[in-house]
């Protein structure tokens, strides 16, 4: 006895309606067929998909479950059930459905991809990575899976792999604006700011109204110190989306750096009006008010930032700085200590804590002895360079070449040209015994030079090849220039020449000092210490590398 089923004409018409996106007609026909042929599994499955398309997920769930009941081995039906359950925020059940689809059809690339999405949503990124990779193995040109893999790798901080995956996405689909945007984000995290800029601009050319990319481009331009361009990008983002809170806040940061404090204040207040619990915007507003000399207002704003985010180390630190300027030194020290306790790696808080404790100890000593002479700047150093020497271990140079590095041209500071440098400013924290030995020796030399304890704020190495160098610069940052603390007078820069390279050339790498002008031709083992405020530059053109270690430090 044959089982009755719909005619081929009915099924062809149903499929045609669906393919032409005539979902109303498709639903009517599917419902009609299921009433006439209630055991016809395929029609129930199609009805479920139609209802997904029109957003009626609960009804779709019923139809799809019916199709699975009629044919439990239909992998596509289990896949559809996973889609529905995910849409209903039932992720754990969706995972089971996708896994069942894969069990029934192991080479089901789309199911592997969607399983990866669910695992990512559930916070199981390592498992998600495996699912996306399996989808790609099964379907190498699966653009969506490549993109999902890249995003997962980005979140797992496997940035080099993420970059490769995003580039693969773009190779498969050159007009995919989101992939260009995500590549830009990855490149920015890798410190490749100029390349990130190119990716963002490509995304914008493909999708001019891509608001988030205008904002991200602004952040990159800001990091490249192209502040006028950054301002334009933020304003474009705001024009596209007037309630874009982050763009208003970022615009405020740029305007402050441009010295347009009143405008910066307005931008921060706009961001706060859009998002009253935006602790970072409160903190930035406090900094602007502080710079405008409105210290009482700044204190209130910093306290609001802390109320919104009690573990906000930067806000505690800024409150401490503000209280110090108001003359409340004990309360200031308490705030700085809180910042340091919250984030022991917060460089500014660590520095200020050292400086403030040192100053307090000195003041107490002076008050006890009656000696009120200010010894803060009696370091034994003037604006003139101090020239010293240390024997260079050859293995020290070899170790620097073995360490991870970045190209000079990839930095955003004064360094440029051929050569490489340490990836960060924490060279002295490297555990190699040879590095620890040189750090110990140089620290002792610093202390003897300034006649006090010291706090090292940064340490690094530079390896200059022909054409490498540094533009005129000094080593003062915003905190050093803050007249409330006057730290610039306590800051010094040291350079230790391990190998001077080839000095028989037109550009032998003279250390050029400014105001007053002075030229120093380095020799092997030379250590030069100058005030961090003194401008200096160097250009090197030799055939062999010049190798040096640098450090910036404060006298305490």
What label would you give each PLM region?
Residues 15, 42-53, 64, 76-87, ...:
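Conserved alpha-helical positions within TPR/SEL1-like repeat arrays
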Residues 33, 66-67, 101, 135, ...:
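Canonical positions in the second alpha-helix
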Residues 361-453, 469:
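Non-heme Fe(II)/2-oxoglutarate
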Residues 451-540, 545-556:
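Catalytic core of non-heme Fe(II) oxygenases with the double-stranded beta-helix
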Residues 6-36, 46-49:
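Alpha-helical segment of the N-proximal tetratricopeptide repeat
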């Amino acid at each position: 006895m044959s089982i009755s089923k719909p005619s081929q004409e009915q099924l062809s018409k149903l499929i045609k309606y669906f393919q032409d996106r005539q979902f109303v007609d498709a639903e009517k026909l599917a419902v009609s067929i299921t009433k006439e042929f209630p055991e016809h599994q395929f029609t129930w499955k199609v009805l479920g998909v139609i209802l997904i398309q029109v957003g009626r997920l609960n009804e779709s769930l019923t139809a799809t479950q019916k199709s699975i009941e009629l044919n439990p081995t239909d992998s596509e039906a289990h896949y559809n059930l996973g889609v529905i359950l995910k849409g209903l925020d039932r992720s754990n059940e969706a995972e089971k459905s996708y896994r069942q689809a894969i069990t029934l059809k192991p080479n089901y690339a789309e199911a592997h991809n969607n399983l990866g999405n669910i695992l990512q949503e559930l916070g199981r990124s390592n498992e998600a990575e495996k699912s996306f990779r399996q989808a790609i193995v099964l379907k190498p040109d699966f653009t969506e899976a490549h993109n999902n893999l890249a995003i997962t790798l980005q979140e797992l901080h496997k940035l080099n792999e993420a970059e490769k995956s995003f580039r693969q996405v773009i190779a498969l689909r050159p007009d995919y604006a989101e992939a260009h945007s995500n590549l830009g984000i990855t490149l920015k995290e890798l410190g490749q700011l100029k390349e990130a800029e190119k990716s963002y601009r490509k995304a914008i050319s493909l999708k001019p109204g891509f608001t988030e990319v205008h904002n991200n481009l602004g952040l990159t331009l800001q990091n490249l110190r192209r502040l006028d361009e950054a301002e334009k990008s933020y304003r474009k983002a705001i024009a596209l989306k007037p309630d874009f809170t982050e763009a208003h806040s970022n615009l405020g940061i740029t305007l402050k750096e441009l010295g347009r404090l009143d405008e910066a204040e307005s931008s921060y207040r706009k961001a706060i009006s859009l998002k009253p619990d935006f602790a970072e915007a409160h903190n930035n507003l406090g900094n602007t008010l502080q710079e405008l000399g409105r210290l009482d207002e700044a204190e209130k704003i910093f306290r609001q930032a802390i109320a919104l985010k009690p573990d906000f180390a930067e806000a505690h630190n800024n409150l401490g700085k503000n209280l110090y300027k108001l003359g409340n030194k004990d309360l200031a020290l308490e705030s700085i200590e809180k910042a340091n306790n919250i984030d022991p790696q917060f460089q500014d808080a660590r520095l200020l804590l050292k400086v403030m404790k040192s100053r307090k100890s000195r003041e107490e000593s002076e008050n006890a002895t009656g000696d009120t002479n200010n010894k803060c700047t009696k370091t034994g150093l003037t604006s003139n360079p101090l020239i010293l020497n240390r024997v260079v271990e050859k293995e020290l140079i070899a170790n620097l070449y073995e360490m991870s590095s970045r190209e000079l041209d990839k930095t955003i500071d004064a360094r440029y040209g051929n050569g490489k440098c340490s990836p960060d400013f924490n060279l002295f924290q490297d555990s190699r015994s040879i590095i620890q030995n040189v750090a110990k020796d140089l620290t002792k030399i610093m202390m003897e030079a300034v006649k006090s304890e010291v706090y090292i704020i940064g340490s690094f190495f530079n390896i200059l090849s022909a054409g490498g160098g540094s533009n005129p610069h000094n080593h003062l940052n915003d905190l050093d220039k803050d007249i409330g603390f006057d730290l610039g007078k306590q800051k010094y820069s040291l350079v230790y020449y391990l190998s001077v390279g080839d000095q028989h050339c037109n550009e032998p790498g003279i250390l050029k000092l400014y105001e007053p002008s002075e030229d120093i031709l380095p020799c092997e083992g030379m250590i030069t210490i100058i005030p961090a405020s003194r401008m200096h530059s160097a250009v090197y053109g030799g055939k062999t590398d010049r190798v040096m270690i640098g450090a910036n430090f404060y006298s305490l």
